[in-house]
């Protein structure tokens, strides 16, 4: 049994398979997920687990060189925006509709129980060397 890092077997498998510039999404429970993208649903009920909780655990286990978020998060969800800017990882913003279109390039979407608007981010994998 693993002692450290993400215990969810599907998330651990995806993280271990990422190469440089591969992308995964951490999403609220309302984001539409493209049919061809794996969905790892960790939601238990509204708000559990939260977007911020899942983001923190993934960032502790994944090398991330960039984030992509919806432009609307800045005004519509200041708490999530603070969490994103607090990572000190460069953020590129897109209009929400374009953000949704971009998720089709992800290897997986991790669906949280988050129920606040625009609580979604695309993480671009970096390298550890």
UniProtKB/Swiss-Prot annotation:
Substrate binds at residues 28, 96, 118-120. Its EC number is 5.4.99.62. It is found in: Cytoplasm. Pathway: Carbohydrate metabolism; D-ribose degradation; D-ribose 5-phosphate from beta-D-ribopyranose: step 1/2. Its main location: cytoplasm. One of its GO terms (cellular component) is cytosol. Catalyzes the interconversion of beta-pyran and beta-furan forms of D-ribose. Homodecamer. This is D-ribose pyranase. The gene is rbsD.
